[in-house]
Amino acid sequence: MSWSLFKTKCNVLTGPQHISTELFAQTITSGYHQAVSLHFDSMSAGGKIVNNAPKLPILYNQFLAQCKANLAQHNEIHILNQMGPMILNYWAGIIIQGPTGTSSVLNPGTWTGIPVVQNFDFQIILNAMITCFRTHIMTLQGQYVSSVLPGVTSSWAGPMLQSLP
Protein backbone atom coordinates (compact mmCIF):
# COMPACT_ATOMS: atom_id res chain seq x y z
CA MET A 1 0.00 0.00 0.00
CA SER A 2 1.35 3.36 -0.88
CA TRP A 3 0.86 6.53 1.12
CA SER A 4 -1.68 7.68 -1.46
CA LEU A 5 -3.72 4.55 -0.72
CA PHE A 6 -3.40 5.32 3.01
CA LYS A 7 -4.85 8.73 2.26
CA THR A 8 -7.67 7.19 0.22
CA LYS A 9 -8.49 4.79 3.06
CA CYS A 10 -8.58 7.68 5.55
CA ASN A 11 -10.90 9.72 3.33
CA VAL A 12 -13.78 7.71 4.81
CA LEU A 13 -13.37 10.08 7.76
CA THR A 14 -14.43 13.06 5.64
CA GLY A 15 -17.96 11.78 5.05
CA PRO A 16 -20.41 12.03 7.93
CA GLN A 17 -20.03 14.93 10.32
CA HIS A 18 -19.98 12.81 13.46
CA ILE A 19 -17.39 10.09 13.02
CA SER A 20 -16.90 8.14 16.24
CA THR A 21 -13.60 8.42 18.08
CA GLU A 22 -13.19 4.65 17.75
CA LEU A 23 -13.65 4.73 13.97
CA PHE A 24 -11.20 7.63 13.67
CA ALA A 25 -8.54 5.81 15.71
CA GLN A 26 -9.15 2.50 13.94
CA THR A 27 -8.96 4.02 10.45
CA ILE A 28 -5.74 5.96 11.08
CA THR A 29 -3.92 3.14 12.89
CA SER A 30 -4.98 0.32 10.56
CA GLY A 31 -4.14 2.47 7.53
CA TYR A 32 -0.68 3.20 8.94
CA HIS A 33 -0.15 -0.47 9.80
CA GLN A 34 -1.13 -1.56 6.29
CA ALA A 35 1.05 1.10 4.69
CA VAL A 36 4.20 0.09 6.56
CA SER A 37 3.43 -3.63 6.22
CA LEU A 38 3.64 -3.28 2.46
CA HIS A 39 6.99 -1.49 2.48
CA PHE A 40 9.93 -3.54 1.30
CA ASP A 41 13.57 -3.50 2.32
CA SER A 42 16.02 -3.08 -0.55
CA MET A 43 19.01 -4.32 1.46
CA SER A 44 17.45 -7.75 2.07
CA ALA A 45 16.20 -8.01 -1.53
CA GLY A 46 12.58 -7.14 -0.94
CA GLY A 47 12.31 -8.07 2.73
CA LYS A 48 9.01 -7.59 4.53
CA ILE A 49 8.26 -6.66 8.12
CA VAL A 50 7.49 -9.93 9.90
CA ASN A 51 6.66 -9.04 13.51
CA ASN A 52 4.44 -5.96 13.44
CA ALA A 53 1.04 -7.69 13.68
CA PRO A 54 0.96 -7.63 17.52
CA LYS A 55 1.81 -3.93 17.44
CA LEU A 56 -1.46 -2.84 15.76
CA PRO A 57 -3.74 -3.34 18.81
CA ILE A 58 -1.24 -1.49 21.00
CA LEU A 59 -1.02 1.40 18.52
CA TYR A 60 -4.83 1.51 18.26
CA ASN A 61 -5.36 1.55 22.04
CA GLN A 62 -2.74 4.26 22.57
CA PHE A 63 -4.15 6.43 19.79
CA LEU A 64 -7.74 5.91 20.95
CA ALA A 65 -6.83 6.85 24.53
CA GLN A 66 -5.11 10.02 23.28
CA CYS A 67 -8.08 10.96 21.08
CA LYS A 68 -10.50 10.49 24.00
CA ALA A 69 -8.27 12.58 26.25
CA ASN A 70 -8.18 15.29 23.57
CA LEU A 71 -11.98 15.51 23.53
CA ALA A 72 -11.85 16.81 27.10
CA GLN A 73 -9.27 19.48 26.23
CA HIS A 74 -10.13 23.10 25.65
CA ASN A 75 -6.59 24.09 24.74
CA GLU A 76 -4.94 23.84 21.35
CA ILE A 77 -4.14 20.22 20.44
CA HIS A 78 -1.26 19.05 18.26
CA ILE A 79 -2.24 15.48 17.42
CA LEU A 80 0.81 14.98 15.20
CA ASN A 81 3.13 15.72 18.12
CA GLN A 82 1.10 13.41 20.35
CA MET A 83 1.47 10.55 17.86
CA GLY A 84 5.26 10.55 18.12
CA PRO A 85 5.75 8.24 21.11
CA MET A 86 3.14 5.83 19.72
CA ILE A 87 4.89 5.53 16.37
CA LEU A 88 8.31 5.15 18.01
CA ASN A 89 6.89 2.36 20.18
CA TYR A 90 5.45 0.68 17.08
CA TRP A 91 8.88 0.54 15.43
CA ALA A 92 10.86 -0.64 18.46
CA GLY A 93 12.19 -4.13 17.74
CA ILE A 94 10.77 -4.49 14.22
CA ILE A 95 12.37 -7.26 12.14
CA ILE A 96 12.45 -7.24 8.34
CA GLN A 97 13.19 -10.56 6.70
CA GLY A 98 14.07 -11.07 3.06
CA PRO A 99 15.71 -13.62 0.77
CA THR A 100 19.23 -12.32 1.37
CA GLY A 101 19.09 -11.52 5.08
CA THR A 102 17.41 -9.91 8.03
CA SER A 103 17.29 -6.27 9.09
CA SER A 104 16.49 -5.38 12.68
CA VAL A 105 15.38 -1.93 13.82
CA LEU A 106 17.62 -1.11 16.79
CA ASN A 107 16.78 2.60 16.98
CA PRO A 108 13.14 3.55 16.31
CA GLY A 109 14.26 6.93 15.02
CA THR A 110 13.01 10.38 15.85
CA TRP A 111 9.57 11.86 15.39
CA THR A 112 9.00 15.38 14.19
CA GLY A 113 5.41 16.52 14.45
CA ILE A 114 4.22 19.30 12.20
CA PRO A 115 2.00 21.91 13.85
CA VAL A 116 -1.24 22.13 11.90
CA VAL A 117 -3.32 25.26 12.35
CA GLN A 118 -6.92 24.50 13.26
CA ASN A 119 -8.97 24.13 10.09
CA PHE A 120 -11.91 22.25 8.65
CA ASP A 121 -10.06 20.61 5.76
CA PHE A 122 -9.10 17.05 6.71
CA GLN A 123 -6.82 16.81 3.65
CA ILE A 124 -4.42 19.30 5.25
CA ILE A 125 -4.18 17.13 8.35
CA LEU A 126 -3.78 13.94 6.29
CA ASN A 127 -1.00 15.47 4.17
CA ALA A 128 0.82 16.63 7.30
CA MET A 129 0.39 13.18 8.86
CA ILE A 130 1.83 11.45 5.79
CA THR A 131 4.75 13.88 5.79
CA CYS A 132 5.47 13.03 9.43
CA PHE A 133 5.22 9.28 8.72
CA ARG A 134 7.55 9.44 5.72
CA THR A 135 10.04 11.69 7.50
CA HIS A 136 10.09 9.39 10.51
CA ILE A 137 10.84 6.27 8.44
CA MET A 138 13.97 8.00 7.14
CA THR A 139 15.32 8.21 10.72
CA LEU A 140 15.08 4.48 11.52
CA GLN A 141 18.39 2.75 12.23
CA GLY A 142 19.35 -0.85 12.69
CA GLN A 143 21.51 -3.73 11.60
CA TYR A 144 21.43 -6.01 8.57
CA VAL A 145 22.65 -9.60 8.86
CA SER A 146 23.28 -11.45 5.60
CA SER A 147 21.99 -14.99 5.17
CA VAL A 148 23.93 -15.38 1.92
CA LEU A 149 27.35 -14.59 3.38
CA PRO A 150 27.40 -15.87 6.99
CA GLY A 151 28.89 -13.44 9.45
CA VAL A 152 28.45 -10.39 7.24
CA THR A 153 26.63 -7.54 8.97
CA SER A 154 26.08 -3.95 8.03
CA SER A 155 24.39 -0.92 9.50
CA TRP A 156 20.88 -0.38 8.20
CA ALA A 157 18.81 2.79 7.92
CA GLY A 158 15.22 3.73 7.14
CA PRO A 159 15.90 4.90 3.57
CA MET A 160 16.45 1.21 2.73
CA LEU A 161 12.77 0.65 3.54
CA GLN A 162 10.86 1.65 0.44
CA SER A 163 7.25 2.08 -0.55
CA LEU A 164 5.26 2.60 -3.66
CA PRO A 165 4.55 6.27 -4.41
Predicted regions and their residues:
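Amphipathic alpha-helical hairpins/coiled-coils and adjacent low-complexity
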Residues: 1-165
